[in-house]
């Protein structure tokens, strides 16, 4: 979002038939991919705004349930003239699957929720950090969540676990970046 690239110069073929987008677009694409990967990219995830209505004695269970799912309470207040307590929270969509069922179980069916899309938020962690070791059948720690999401998505699509910058640079440019210690992944 909000990225702008300016092409300052290009040497095109002399023959008019050989000139065109096919000469510039692949080179520009490789340069932009490499720029994004060397700029420590981050993943974004959708976040729901959740409104939960329940009796006041169920609020502690709601807080516990939201805390286990990376949710955060934005506001809570009783509804005037009723025994109902209203809690507004932000909950990542990734952690919202099964939330309503868990909410009903935790409150013996006394609470119900309404979820709507609210915003995009940065997923914690660096998706390109190779130092993070992911173990099968174990939840990733919060600092490794972005890495886990990227690796699982790449595996599902049949791609290698890691992105290699070498495919976006020519050998001389790659050697120059390595000498500058850019941290090639």
Predicted regions and their residues:
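Accessory interaction regions appended to the cores of large information-processing enzymes
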Residues: 1-185
């Amino acid at each position: 979002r909000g990225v702008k690239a300016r092409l300052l110069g290009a040497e095109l073929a002399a023959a008019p038939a050989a000139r065109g987008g096919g000469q510039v677009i692949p080179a520009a694409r490789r340069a932009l991919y490499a720029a994004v990967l060397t700029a420590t990219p981050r993943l974004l995830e959708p976040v729901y705004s959740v409104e939960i209505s329940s009796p006041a004695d169920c609020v502690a269970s709601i807080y516990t349930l939201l805390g286990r799912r990376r949710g955060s309470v934005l506001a809570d207040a009783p509804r005037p003239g009723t025994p109902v307590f209203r809690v507004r929270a932000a909950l990542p969509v990734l952690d919202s699957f099964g939330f309503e069922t868990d909410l009903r179980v935790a409150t013996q069916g006394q609470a119900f929720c309404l979820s709507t899309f609210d915003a995009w938020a940065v997923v914690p962690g660096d998706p390109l950090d190779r130092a993070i070791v992911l173990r099968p059948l174990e939840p990733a720690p919060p600092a490794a969540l972005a890495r886990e999401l990227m690796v699982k998505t790449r595996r599902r699509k049949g791609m290698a676990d890691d992105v290699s910058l070498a495919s976006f640079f020519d050998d001389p440019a790659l050697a120059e970046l390595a000498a500058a210690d850019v941290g090639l992944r």
